[in-house]
Curated annotation (Swiss-Prot):
Zn(2+) 2 binds at D146, E180, H385. The active site is at D86, E179 (proton acceptor). Coiled coil: none annotated. This is Peptidase T. Transmembrane segments: none annotated. One of its GO terms (molecular function) is metallopeptidase activity. NCBIfam families: peptidase-T, PRK05469.1, PRK13381.1. One of its GO terms (cellular component) is cytosol. InterPro entries: ArgE/DapE_CS, Bact_exopeptidase_dim_dom, Peptidase_M20, Peptidase_M20_dimer, Peptidase_M20B. It catalyses: Release of the N-terminal residue from a tripeptide. It comes from Haemophilus influenzae (strain PittEE). Cleaves the N-terminal amino acid of tripeptides. Belongs to the peptidase M20B family. Zn(2+) 1 binds at H84, D146, D202.
Amino acid sequence: MISQIDKTELLERFLHYVSFHTQSKPNAKHSPSSVGQMKLAMQLQKELIQFGLENVEVSKYAVVTAFLPANDPNLTKTIGLVAHLDTSPQCSGKNVRLEVIEEYRGGDIALGIGEEFISPVYYSFMQKLVGQTLIVTDGTTLLGADNKAGIAEIMTALSILQKENIPHCNIRVAFTPDEEIGLGIHYFPMEKFSCDWAYTIDGGEVGELEYENFNAATAKVRFFGRNIHTGYAKGKMLNALTLACEFQQVFPVDEVPEKTDGKAGFYHLEDFFGDIEQVELTYLIRDFDEQNFAQRKAFIKNQVEKFNAKKGLKKPIELEIQDSYQNMYDVVKNVPQSIELADRAMKAVGIKPNHKPIRGGTDGAFLASKGLACPNIFTGGYNFHSKHELVSLQGMENTVQVIIEMLKCKDL
């Protein structure tokens, strides 16, 4: 058994990491896409060295890697732990101002002095958090629990393992940049992360264990128009904005994120940018089933062809589709120990595992494409990518307990 986790130390570590502005930039051509990610990477390198880890390195892409050898000759497995440095570009992560709510009593939580609030009317999970310590923002930025809670939990677990000399297997650690924009993992040094399997610590509610995720692609559709003075435009103007609006109407109205859950896929119009002369629509394509995923991509291709044939445009609309990541399950299913170990660890600390698909992606999906099984473990956070993001300190403590229990590698 480990001694009780010092919640104050865990909280302070998390708050310190949140102070780094690490928001990624979607259109970046290099990684890391923001300076703050490298600054946080250097801070983590310093701490990992202090903890006594070996081969602690930061690449020019801000990928942090480190190794902690087993302290028990009977524990021969090598387990990896992964979290990402960046925060989502969908909501500002600069100058995060926090509030720590001790012993949440239920009801609405006012965020700062503005009109933003978090309510159990909209977020029913809040009823489960009564009595816990919650960390929220002032309602002007996201929190950054995704994924700095995961970083803090990994670092706290490593600190405890070393302080208390708890028997553990070989441990690989990696902190990656630009997970939110799908860029950083492309520069991941697999040769420095040799392990039997790994876990991303990037999930949400306590108990979550995820090893299925969307197949994902991004489609960009470009429209070209012709601008003329509006007073003399009859028969001459071609409005690319109007063309784009018309094209958007061909998509099934119920196959969107706000109307789907579980394993249902969707199309998501993520961005609409341009003017009369040129417009670009950006769509996210998501589906768990590989065949359905292929059909979704084919649907967009067919609609572009039909639209061009119908309009007879001098400059036809253009389509570019790029795959982002694949469902990790095809790899994880061949390493069932990765799921069994996480299950046992949760049960050992009194947590009921909740197996569920990820309606998104993690670095684990990219690692799986390289042949490394990498399920996802909860962090205790909620409402990621939004001003309503929050994390439970008790949930974070639970994650630390599960990480330590997994690294004991019992019965493997």
